From Swiss-Prot:
Compartmental location: Cytoplasm
GO biological process: cysteine biosynthetic process; hydrogen sulfide biosynthetic process; sulfate assimilation, phosphoadenylyl sulfate reduction by phosphoadenylyl-sulfate reductase (thioredoxin)
Catalytic machinery residues: C242 (nucleophile)
Cross-referenced InterPro entries: APS_reductase, PAPS/APS_Rdtase, PAPS_reduct_dom, Rossmann-like_a/b/a_fold
Function: Catalyzes the formation of sulfite from adenosine 5'-phosphosulfate (APS) using thioredoxin as an electron donor.
GO molecular function list: 4 iron, 4 sulfur cluster binding; adenylyl-sulfate reductase (thioredoxin) activity; metal ion binding; phosphoadenylyl-sulfate reductase (thioredoxin) activity
Top class in the EC scheme: oxidoreductase
Listed Pfam families: PAPS_reduct
Pathway: Sulfur metabolism; hydrogen sulfide biosynthesis; sulfite from sulfate
Entry keyword Cytoplasm: yes
Protein's name in the database: Adenosine 5'-phosphosulfate reductase
Transferase is among the record's keywords: no
NCBIfam families per UniProt: APS_reductase, cysH, PRK02090.1
């Protein structure tokens, strides 16, 4: 039976993810993105209120995933969580990626500005309760944006942190209720760098300044040499993930 992706139920999307995970076990990033396009690319009509097809998430550390996706779907939707706390270099990278790769950047923002949050929650919530800050400025806007799509593509990789060591290529994201594709999950740091060099990929200038994992400015520091690349995120706290990749 053919499933109307734009109106697919959670159970139907879960079944699609399960079949895809089996059929594309060991597939390349390009093959995974082509499957994503073939399965979800037609999307739906926004005028009907149905779900769109899929969106590609990027933290704008580099343009690798966006470059890969744009070759399969020129003008693809790219999700950027504009928390209000980003480094200027990250915002600059976002703008350059949109222009150079010709994609449609969707800026997901919290309902409250940083100033409004300071009034409601107290100044510098990130320092007192980083989990709540991430919930308000990342998780909630992400959930709202993803509710309009049937699938999302992320750039998480297994080598980035122990919490991501078993990241699947395709799964059903129970937290957000849609299919999740991680096409570069198996890539090593060397493979990433080779793709960047070979294709002259845009890279956030902060990477060359010693930031291998870039998030919000107040919660990002340079990790010690040889340590977990994500150890510079929320340094000094037990927190290691912002809640976007819990499933």
């Amino acid at each position: 039976m053919t499933v109307d992706i734009s109106r697919a139920t959670a159970d139907e999307l879960r079944s699609i993810a399960e079949r895809g995970a089996v059929e594309l076990d060991g597939a390349s990033a390009q093959e995974l993105l082509q499957w994503t396009e073939d399965t979800f690319g037609d999307g739906a009509s926004a005028a009907t209120g149905d779900r769109n097809g899929y969106i590609v998430a990027s933290n704008m550390q580099d343009g690798v995933l966006v470059h890969l996706a744009a070759q399969v779907h020129p003008g693809v939707d790219v999700l950027f969580l504009d928390t209000g706390y980003h480094f200027p270099e990250t915002i600059g990278t976002r703008d350059a990626v949109e222009q150079v790769y010709g994609v449609n950047v969707i800026n997901a923002r919290a309902l409250a500005s940083v100033a409004e949050q300071d009034v409601a929650e107290g100044k510098d919530l990130f320092a007192r309760d980083p989990n709540r800050c991430c919930a308000l400025r990342k998780v909630a806007p992400l959930k709202q944006t993803l509710s309009g799509y049937s699938a999302w593509v992320t750039g998480i990789r297994r080598v980035e942190a122990p919490t991501r060591a078993n990241a699947p290529l395709i799964s059903f994201d129970e937290a957000f209720g849609l299919v999740k594709i991680n096409p570069i999950a198996p890539w090593s740091d060397e493979e990433m760098q080779n793709y960047i060099d070979t294709n002259s990929i845009l890279v956030n200038p902060l990477v060359d300044e010693g930031y291998p994992s870039i998030g919000c400015a107040p919660c990002t520091s340079k990790p010690a040499p040889g340590s977990d690349p994500r150890s510079g995120r929320w340094a000094g706290a037990s927190k290691t993930e912002c809640g976007l990749h819990a499933s």
